[in-house]
Regions:
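Redox- and metal-dependent alpha/beta enzyme cores, enriched for Fe-S-associated oxidoreductases
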Residues: 5-77
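Extended, well-folded catalytic/binding cores that form a central cleft or groove in large enzyme
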Residues: 58-61, 77-78, 84-85, 103, ...
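Gly/Ser/Thr-rich loops at beta-strand to alpha-helix junctions
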Residues: 4-14, 33-34, 89-98, 120-121
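Short Gly/Thr/Asp-enriched flexible loops that form oxyanion-binding sites at enzyme active sites
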Residues: 96-107
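A polyampholytic, Gly/Pro-enriched intrinsically disordered region
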Residues: 46-54, 131-143
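Short, flexible loop segments at boundaries between secondary-structure elements
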Residues: 108-140
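Short beta-strand-loop elements within alpha/beta enzyme cores
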Residues: 83-91, 114
């Protein structure tokens, strides 16, 4: 099963998925997003991919700013779909990527991280947003 955490670059999940042998796709969109319009933008940017893989039926949501919510969403996907192998592509936010990595570390028996290596465009983003701090140690110690 392929689980892409969707961002704004609609070609990336398709490219990663093309390298895999996954028939079922359960995409995750950040909701709420860092800005109100971001979830709708992410879905719009990935619309052709979601149509192509029938991804709307298994579409899930996890807060863009919370790695622990992504972790819980991945655990829920595993339970709901009785998944024995997840290929997770952290293509969304950095906190979502952290949640994906925590899940893969905890569930290394079924989860793996798959990632592309995009070429960064010039003048893409400016400035620095809010800094988020996460107590990962307590989360890991609770395992």
């Amino acid at each position: 099963m392929f689980v892409p955490l969707l961002g704004f670059e609609g070609s990336r999940p398709r490219l990663v998925h093309s390298e895999l042998d996954a028939s079922l796709v359960a995409p995750i969109v950040g909701l709420p997003g860092f800005r109100m319009e971001f979830p709708a933008v992410a879905v719009a940017c990935n619309q052709s991919y979601l149509d192509e893989v029938n991804g709307y039926g298994q579409l899930r949501y996890a807060r863009s700013s919370c790695p622990f919510d992504v972790y819980s969403t991945l655990a829920q996907i595993t339970r709901d779909l009785d998944a024995d192998h997840l290929q997770v592509a952290p293509l969304g936010t950095k906190p979502q990527a952290l949640g994906a990595f925590l899940f893969a570390l905890r569930r290394e028996d079924i989860a793996e991280i798959v990632y592309d290596h995009p070429i960064r465009r010039a003048n893409r983003t400016e400035g620095i947003g809010t800094t988020h701090l996460y107590n990962v140690s307590d989360f890991v110690d609770a395992w």
